Each structure stands twice: as C-alpha cells, then as structure tokens.
Amino acid sequence: MKLFLVSIVLVGMLVLAAARPERDIDSFDEQEEKGFVKRGASCDCHPFVGTYWFGISNCPSGHGYRKKCASFFGVCCVK
C-alpha cells in the first residue's frame, strides 16, 4: 500500500513537470520591459552602498554595475 502511494505521488510529479510550458520564464530584459523586475536589497561594498542580488555570483548585465563584492549566498553590485 505504501509503495502504491509513493508511486502515485511520483507519477503525479512527473506529469506536472512534463506539462510545464516550454518557455514560462521571460528573460531579464523582457521582465524589465514589462515592469516585473524586483530590485535587490541594499548592501555594503566597502566603502560604497550597492544592491544585493541573492543566488547569483555575478551582477546582472546591462544595468551599469561597475563593482561587485561577494556576499552571503549572492553578490553586492555597485553602480
């Protein structure tokens, strides 16, 4: 019975993953044009104040960032 339930859950997950649209996430530039881009929090990049971006190791291109500092699970970018 337990194996049957686990199998049903796994099959359901596979069906949902396969049903996902091929291109459901717009590029960063397309999001910016639509006004969907969220800004990061402020951070210190000694002695400057920058924008903290979580989960990436480089600053987003095309935004005029000229300096970056590594931060906890992300990067601090300074214009």
Curated annotation (Swiss-Prot):
Gene3D superfamilies: Anthopleurin-A. GO terms for molecular function: ion channel inhibitor activity; toxin activity. Residues 1-19 form the signal peptide. GO terms for biological process: defense response to bacterium; innate immune response. The keyword Zinc does not apply. InterPro entries: BDS_K_chnl_tox (IPR012414), Myo_ane_neurotoxin_sf (IPR023355). It is found in: Secreted; Nematocyst. Pfam families: Defensin_4. Induction: Transcriptionally up-regulated by immune challenge. The keyword Signal applies. Disulfide bonds join C43-C76, C45-C69, C59-C77. Highly expressed by the mesenteries. Moderately expressed by the pharynx. Weakly expressed by the gonad and pedal disk. No expression in tentacle. Keywords: Antibiotic, Antimicrobial, Cleavage on pair of basic residues, Disulfide bond, Immunity, Innate immunity, Ion channel impairing toxin, Nematocyst, Neurotoxin, Secreted, Signal, Toxin. Residues 20-39 form a propeptide. One of its GO terms (cellular component) is extracellular region. Belongs to the sea anemone type 3 (BDS) potassium channel toxin family. Peptide with both antimicrobial and neurotoxin activities. Cationic AMP with antibacterial activity against both Gram-positive bacteria (B.subtilis, MIC=11.49 ug/mL) and Gram-negative bacteria (E.coli (MIC=12.21 ug/mL) and S.enterica (MIC=11.95 ug/mL)). Shows no significant antimicrobial activity against bacteria S.aureus and P.aeruginosa, as well as the fungus C.albicans. In vivo, induces reversible paralytic activity towards the shrimp P.paucidens. May act by impairing sodium or potassium channels in the prey. This is Crassicorin-I. It comes from Urticina crassicornis.
